[in-house]
Curated annotation (Swiss-Prot):
Comment on bound cofactor: Binds 1 Mg(2+) ion per subunit. Binds 2 Zn(2+) ions per subunit.
Record's keyword annotation contains Transferase: yes
Gene Ontology CC terms: DNA-directed RNA polymerase complex
Function: DNA-dependent RNA polymerase catalyzes the transcription of DNA into RNA using the four ribonucleoside triphosphates as substrates.
A GO molecular function held by the record: zinc ion binding
Designated name of the protein: DNA-directed RNA polymerase subunit beta'
Enzyme class, UniProt record, top EC level: transferase
Catalytic activity, reaction form: RNA(n) + a ribonucleoside 5'-triphosphate = RNA(n+1) + diphosphate
Organism per entry: Rhizobium etli (strain ATCC 51251 / DSM 11541 / JCM 21823 / NBRC 15573 / CFN 42)
Residues annotated for Zn(2+) 2 binding in this entry: 811, 885, 892, 895
């Protein structure tokens, strides 16, 4: 009853519950049904009385009263007249709030086209009428007539006529023989008279007959629009408006400013123009004005309505008085400031404050310090309530006074109020979910918020003036969620990689590292201590130091809780750390009996978390932080200039390198090497020199020295301690301080040949300083640009993945991905164990030798299992993946695996898509902010050999080798791999060997670890002959296809192939080297082809005509690209390029089938390469390759499906089409990971897999079967499955399709939810498409639900959604039973059944 009374006062309609939102085109009747009256005058308000004009844009009669419950003339005031319509002024007595809801309309004197359907490409109106957009515009803007009904005349339907042609036609045929119209009326007639069913039928039959691709595409576009209209029930003529709706006046307010001026919304100006022109047109029609005047007025009306809906879309932009373009209705929705992103997705919050942060080292991990002033303000309502309850005040007014005067009892009550009431702290930019965490407030004096030092990493906060915002969760549910889910103690692990994020940093690490150092010859060395008490005593009395080597008894408890003790060789410092370990025997002392670098501390915290749980970890972290700080303070580590050690050998290394560079210069002058090769070698030489100086410096700094007098070990170099412990600084920075700065990069990314030999301690010369400014400035410029880029990448990722939620426990799929260790240049960069930890095994994993079971199929692979798997030497494991999950919406828990931030299997309702997007996007921003730390120092040492990473026996796959004239083995195969097998015959490593490499081992050889297997020249790619004979040149014409450069000083000539197609004379040449046999004929290769080797541009000839060559000799060399520095600059755009699935500029060409290469007849500037298939019944495939691109295959080479015919970056679409989803996934994951790995950022593969899954949601129809699809349609995978199920049920032929890879932007725009797509990008286009198709948004994702103001269907909101879903399905069941008339008796067992099968809400 109370609620009803309240509603009576508030005039509120209770909120409606709805499950979906539909959008369609408004018919004129619909617009009139919304409207409360027609607006006839352009007037707004009377400037003297400030009252709205009647029938004007703010009319109170149409839109409602200005003041609550008061009519305009003031005859009726107060609640008691509610609902009465005043007879004098015609205003209904009600709330003024209705002025935000009630709409009006304008009856147009002539129809006008809706600009969205006309100009939003592709134009819907012109596609539907099958005319060009230009022609439609000519008709609409009164330039041409159009023939709508030719009758018996020679005119054609839809023919355009100019004014003169129309007059002539009227004269010729008479006015009633044909109909030609002009303006929107004409288009309206044409659209209204369309028979959509007939058109659709005609288009389908035409599609079946046509063969031309272009025509098919055009017909498909039209058919799609026609079908959209048919399915949605929209009529085509509704795209032409006869009535314009007017939005409520309070949404386009008019505010009086002081001084008698008004501030108004632009919409009022735009509406005013429409009304003025419309009224003028009405008057002209009444006056029977000449046609030309009326037509002009109609055109102007059309333009003003265009401007109202989308200003600037057509013609010139309409500007206001101050030359500013007016904001139209479309602009209200678009972009960052539009309705979607500004108001619906980005709302402001009350109960919040912000202030500067300072460090609070005495806080517990779950606490933060809140300034008293701030707390008083934030918790006011709670304080008022408590004051009232305790009887300090009887009214809110009294309570207010007490609080304002800051009476002592207020502070006591504030203490009570904030106890156990968590607050949220947020630091902008919030790049991942750890940017907002909950803490329990403790009151502090002053005005700064105190933050616990350990959570700084998560917030990326420091105390140089950062500010943070505080928010108060008000409702009980909000407080509960803050405490249970967001408390800082619950966020110990990083969601991106599962490593601890609450890890000591900087001073704390330094303190712990200092504690754990072991020095030789310290006082008391070799003493033994029975317990920690004794040890403390000895430390106090200075019998031992923290670093003395001692033997100590460490007491702990075993698994059963029985105390035991063990003696360790250790130091007092390490025992102090061990003292803090949780006393439950699960974490052994060994973990802190080592040097405590940041990595080791992180490992220690991780072990404690996995074995002892969250509570112990939090207590341990707090204690370890206190210990670290206190010992960093006591150690007093600082550094002076002498700590930067310059190695004595530096001068010699530099001198040697300078001589080497001179030698290269000489070789270049002698014509032995090219400019490019010289550049590469010089850069390489300096790169190696820098490394060498750095190594010497590190060796010097690391060296252990002893004091001559006391024999004690001297204290360590403090710079080395800082860097080595991971507290601050990196070896790279140390190298610049004490070694040599090394090579610098130009802004273009090329490396400057002259390095910076000085370091910062010696000081730079002017030239060196100038060279280094490039890098420094580039760093700063990059940072500014990349922050925006990275933010945009994150936004696209979130948008594409926002509806990916864990919805089921297990999908039961049989498919998955194969995981192997990632090896790069012989180094294992990501071990198999690291990649499979926390994933679900697809098959049973057994030990390859003993056959004993390690992990069952469908079980999660945990830390102990990983150790077993690595021990067993298993090379590859199949795991479940989000990519292959078969759930229709979202993913299942088993495919996803472990929730990285909790270390447990992932919960139902976890928003894994958003977490994945944040995990990938967050380091993007981080990296961009970190580019300039190295000051642009270039790092380049090219790899030129293969080493064995394991011991074992060599096996060569696809072996194809020759011995050359020097007697060494040379690799002649294009895809040879060298594998190493261990004694059990299990493959331990497998590496590809480049063509032309020298092999040091052969099949069956035994190798030791680190032994050289093969080496090659990293700067050139050789072309070698496999037959012996005499060289002859073909088409190598001086000046046309080859340039001969002679060096005057040495007389040595070298020949380089130049681009022969740049001159008309050279266009038919095919420069090649031919090998003739003894009888003068062209020698034959082993595969049967001729020994003719085609040369590519820039190849340098190594032989002369007539030279005798033997097998494996080099004929020519092609130089490779010069080294550019890699830093994330190449990185961020690279990641974006991969996620956007763009085709790289010079992309690789991939073989689609296995077979033999044949070179066909060449075109003018393309080379034809044909693959003759190896198996029967397969058509040969032909590729066109631009001439002059380095092409390394010869006629008759055997090639496998998926091999590269032309090198380069492959296009991801090709990988998907040729090798399938799994290959695509592994390519994308590896490429993206490589970029992040370069920066030392660890991201779990599963995050990238989730995004790739979202990119693969669409299928291109290859065979329509009996469905209504058209071949080439892009449909949702889920939709296709549903349609096919129906078709199979009816015994019809299902449609089939190929998966398509969409870039993240495209995928976001093609999401089934139009609300989500519209709020992302291209708002008008998305809404236009959705309206025509009459789309329904099922509100599945997070974004849509935020926009309509509901709980998101993830987390706690997901449970509610689930409960609602189960409830409705039960209701339906009962209703169904009732209908059948079996009564409710049968319904109960079914419900029982449903309750058991319902997914558990976790």
């Amino acid at each position: 009853m109370n609620q009803e009374v309240m509603n009576l006062f508030n005039g509120q309609v209770p909120a409606q519950n709805f499950d979906s939102i539909r959008i369609s085109i408004a018919s004129p009747e619909k617009i009139l049904s919304w409207s409360y009256g027609e607006i006839k005058k352009p007037e707004t308000i009377n400037y003297r009385t400030f009252k709205p004009e009647r029938d004007g844009l703010f009319c109170a009669r149409i839109f409602g009263p200005i003041k609550d419950y008061e009519c305009l003339c003031g005859k009726y005031k107060r609640m008691k007249y509610k609902g009465i319509i005043c007879e004098k002024c015609g205003v209904e007595v009600t709330l003024s709030r209705v002025r935000r809801e009630r709409m009006g309309h304008i009856e147009l004197a002539a129809p006008v086209a809706h600009i969205w359907f006309l100009k939003s490409l592709p134009s819907r109106i012109s596609t539907l009428l099958d005319m060009t957009l230009k022609d439609v515009e000519r008709v609409l803007y009164f330039e041409n007539y159009i023939v709508t009904e030719p009758g018996l005349t020679a005119l054609k339907e839809h023919q355009l006529l100019t004014e003169e042609e129309y007059m002539l036609a009227v004269d010729e045929y008479g006015e009633d023989q044909f109909t030609a119209m002009i303006g929107a009326e004409a288009i309206y007639e044409m659209l209204a008279s369309m028979n959509l069913e007939k058109i659709a039928g005609d288009l389908r039959s035409e599609l079946a007959d046509t063969t031309s691709d272009l025509k098919q595409k055009k017909l498909m576009k039209r058919l799609k629009i026609v079908e959209n209209f048919m399915e949605s029930g929209n009529r085509p003529e509704w795209m032409i408006m006869k009535v314009v709706p007017v939005i409520p006046p309070d949404l386009r307010p008019l505010v009086p400013l002081d001084g008698g001026r008004f501030a108004t919304s632009d919409l009022n100006d735009l509406y005013r123009r429409v009304i003025n022109r419309n009224n003028r047109l009405k008057r002209l029609i009444e006056l029977r004005a000449p046609g030309i005047i009326i037509r002009n007025e109609k055109r102007m009306l059309q333009e003003s309505v265009d401007a109202l809906f989308d200003n600037g879309r057509r013609g010139r932009v309409i500007t206001g008085a101050n030359k500013r373009p007016l904001k139209s209705l479309s602009d209200m929705l678009k972009g960052k400031q539009g309705r979607f992103r500004q108001n619906l997705l980005g709302k402001r919050v009350d109960y919040s404050g912000r202030s500067v942060i300072v460090t609070g080292p005495e806080l517990k991990l779950h606490q933060c310090g809140l300034p008293k002033k701030m707390a008083l303000e934030l918790f006011k309502p709670f304080i008022y309530a408590r004051l009232d309850a305790k009887g300090y005040s009887s009214t809110v007014k009294q309570a207010k006074k007490l609080v304002e005067k800051e009476k002592p009892e207020v502070w006591d009550i504030l203490d009570e109020v904030i106890r156990e009431h968590p607050v949220l702290l947020n630091r902008a930019p919030t790049l991942h979910r750890l940017g907002i965490q909950a803490f329990e407030p403790t009151l502090v004096e002053g005005k700064a918020i105190q933050l616990h030092p350990l959570v700084c990493t998560a917030f990326n906060a420091d105390f140089d003036g950062d500010q943070m915002a505080v928010h108060v969760p008000l409702s009980l549910e909000a407080q509960l969620e803050a405490r249970v889910l967001m408390m800082s103690t619950n966020n110990i692990l990083h969601p991106a990689n599962g490593a601890p994020i609450i890890v000591p940093s900087q001073d704390m690490v330094l303190g712990l590292y200092y504690l754990s150092i072991l020095n030789q010859n310290e006082p008391g060395e070799g003493m033994a201590f029975s317990d920690l008490g004794e040890l403390h005593h000895a430390l106090e009395s200075k019998v031992v130091t923290l670093h003395t080597k001692i033997r100590g008894r460490f007491k702990s408890v075993d698994e059963d809780g029985k105390p035991y003790s063990k003696i360790y060789e250790t130091t007092p410092g390490r025992l102090l750390i061990g003292e803090l370990l949780p006393k439950n025997g699960k974490v052994p002392f060994d973990i802190c009996n080592q040097e405590m670098t940041k990595k080791n501390i992180s490992k220690m915290i991780d072990t404690v978390y996995r074995h002892c749980g969250q509570k112990d970890t939090v207590i341990f972290c707090d204690r370890i932080m206190q210990l670290g700080f206190s010992h960093a303070c006591r150690a007093g580590i600082s550094f002076g200039k002498d700590d930067m050690v310059i190695p004595a050998t530096k001068a010699k290394i530099v001198a040697d390198t300078e001589n080497l560079v001179k030698e290269y210069e000489q070789q270049y002058n002698d014509g032995l090497i090219t400019q490019g090769e010289k550049y590469n070698k010089v850069v390489d030489a300096w790169g190696k020199a820098t490394e060498k100086v750095a190594e010497e410096m590190m060796a010097r700094i690391k060296a252990v020295e002893f004091d001559e007098n006391t024999g004690r070990q001297k204290p360590m170099n403090s710079i080395y301690m800082m860097s080595h412990s991971g507290a601050r600084g990196s070896p790279n920075q140390m190298r610049q301080l004490g070694g040599m700065r090394g090579l610098m990069a130009k802004p273009s990314g090329e490396i400057i040949e002259t390095p910076i030999i000085s370091n910062f301690k010696e000081g730079l010369t002017v030239n060196e300083y100038f060279n280094s400014t490039h890098g420094a400035r580039k760093g700063l410029a990059d940072t500014a640009l990349k922050t925006a880029n990275s933010g945009y990448l994150t936004r696209r990722l979130v948008d594409v993945a926002q509806d990916c939620i864990v919805t089921h426990v297990d999908c039961g799929t049989e498919t998955g991905l194969t995981m192997t260790a990632i090896v790069d240049a012989g180094q294992v960069v990501a071990s198999l164990g690291a990649r499979i930890l926390g994933r679900t095994a697809l098959d049973d994993i057994d030990h390859p030798v003993t056959g004993e079971r390690i992990v069952d199929a469908g079980k999660m692979i945990l830390e102990p299992d990983v150790i077993e798997i690595e021990k067993a030497g298993i090379q590859s494991i199949r795991i479940r993946s989000a990519l292959t999950c078969e759930i229709q919406t979202g993913v299942c828990s088993v495919c996803y695996g472990r929730d990285l931030a909790r270390g447990t299997p992932v919960n139902m309702g976890e928003a894994v898509g958003v977490i994945a997007a944040q995990s990938i996007g967050e380091p993007g921003t981080q990296l961009t902010m970190r580019t300039f730390h190295l000051g642009g120092t270039a790092t380049v040492v090219d790899q030129s050999f293969l080493e064995a990473s394991y011991e074992g026996t060599v096996q060569i796959k696809n072996r194809n080798v020759l011995r050359n004239s020097e007697g060494s083995l040379v690799a002649m195969g294009r895809n040879m791999t060298v594998q190493i097998l261990d004694e059990r015959g299990v493959e331990r490593s497998s590496q590809r060997v480049a063509y032309g490499s020298k092999l040091h081992v052969d099949e069956g050889d035994k190798v030791k670890r680190g032994q050289r297997l093969a080496e090659w020249d990293p700067y050139t790619r050789p072309m070698m002959t496999e037959v012996a004979g005499t060289v002859q040149f073909e088409d190598l014409v001086d000046g046309l296809s080859v340039l001969e450069a002679t060096d005057e000083s040495t007389g040595i000539t070298k020949r380089q192939v130049i681009d022969w197609r740049s001159t008309p004379r050279g266009s038919d040449l095919k420069p090649a080297i031919v090998i003739k046999d003894a009888s003068g004929n062209v020698a034959k290769l082993s595969r049967g082809g001729d020994a003719r080797f085609l040369l590519s541009v820039d190849a340098i000839l190594s032989v002369e005509p007539g030279t005798k060559v033997s097998q494996g000799d080099v004929l020519a060399r092609s130089p490779l690209e010069s080294a550019k520095t890699k830093d994330i600059t190449g990185g961020l755009p690279r990641v974006a390029e991969l996620f956007e699935a763009r085709r790289p500029k010079d992309h690789a060409i991939i073989a689609e089938i296995d077979g033999t290469i044949r070179l066909g007849r060449d075109y003018k500037n393309k080379r034809r390469v044909i693959i003759e298939p190896a198996e029967d019944g397969v058509e040969p495939v032909e590729y066109l390759i631009p001439k002059g691109k380095p092409f390394h295959l010869q006629d008759g080479d055997y090639i496998e499906k998926g091999d590269y015919i032309l090198d380069g970056n492959p296009a991801p679409h090709d990988i998907l089409a040729i090798k399938g989803v799994e290959a695509l996934a592994s390519y994308l994951v590896n490429e993206i990971q490589e970029v992040y790995r370069l920066q030392g950022v660890v991201i779990n593969d599963k995050h990238i897999e989730v995004i790739v899954r979202q990119m693969l949601q669409k299928v291109e129809i290859t065979d329509a079967g009996d469905s209504t699809y058209i071949v080439g349609d892009n449909v949702d995978r889920i939709e296709l499955e549903d349609v096919n199920d129906h078709l199979i049920e009816q015994g019809k032929k299902p449609a089939s399709g190929e998966p398509v890879l969409l870039g993240i932007t495209k995928a976001s725009l093609q999401t089934p939810s139009f609300i989500s797509a519209a709020s992302f990008q291209e708002t008008t286009k998305v809404l236009t498409e959705a309206a025509i198709a009459g789309k329904t948004d099922g509100l599945q994702g997070l974004k849509e639900n935020v926009i309509v103001g509901r709980l998101i269907p993830a987390g706690t909101g997901g449970t509610m959604t689930q409960i609602r879903r189960i409830a409705t399905s039960r209701d339906e069941l009962i209703l169904e039973e009732r209908r059948k008339g079996t009564g409710a008796a049968v319904a109960t067992p079914m419900l029982q059944d449903m309750a058991e099968n319902a997914p558990a809400a976790e």
